[in-house]
């Protein structure tokens, strides 16, 4: 879940972190993740409005309750991922400063709110929903990993030395 609240920075949103955010937003990894995320959102919407709706009508009451619960988790999980990806795209397109994207309100929730809850073993979910659940969980885990690496889980020892960082910039600007 994208956490809302008072604007606070996750960690130091200085030039180094902003550079990491901008580099990711411009990367092929972002392109692939964004494409996969948006395609999964569209596929899920089509499934839930079409075949999923029909399949849910064939379920017994207990299974239908499990279906409703898991489909809500699925849509919540995907909306969280889509929101995160849209923030990264806004950085890429210049609509948001990389430092602003470091704000804690744009992070994925640390709680397992979007995590799948085990359903009673008697509940058999339709294959289409089960497939979407597995794929959305994998995507969420990957985006959570990216979020933590880019914004939260950075040890001070991992940050580049300020002098070395400046030397690298000078070398890049003026060549070796």
Predicted ranges, named:
Residues 2-176:
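Surface-exposed peri-terminal alpha-helical interaction modules
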């Amino acid at each position: 879940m994208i956490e809302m609240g008072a604007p606070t920075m996750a960690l130091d949103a200085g030039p180094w972190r902003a550079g990491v955010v901008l580099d990711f937003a411009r990367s092929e990894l972002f392109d692939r993740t964004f494409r996969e995320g948006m395609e999964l959102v569209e596929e899920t919407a089509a499934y839930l409005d079409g075949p999923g709706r029909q399949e849910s009508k064939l379920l017994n009451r207990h299974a239908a309750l499990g279906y409703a619960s898991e489909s809500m988790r699925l849509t919540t999980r995907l909306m969280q991922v889509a929101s995160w990806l849209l923030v990264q795209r806004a950085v890429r397109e210049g609509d948001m400063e990389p430092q602003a994207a470091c704000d804690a309100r744009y992070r994925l929730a640390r709680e397992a709110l979007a995590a799948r809850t085990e359903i009673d073993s008697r509940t058999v979910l339709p294959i289409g929903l089960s497939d979407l659940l597995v794929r959305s969980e994998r995507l969420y885990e990957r985006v959570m990993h990216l979020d933590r690496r880019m914004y939260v889980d950075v040890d001070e020892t991992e940050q580049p030395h300020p002098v070395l960082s400046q030397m690298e910039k000078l070398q890049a600007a003026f060549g070796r």
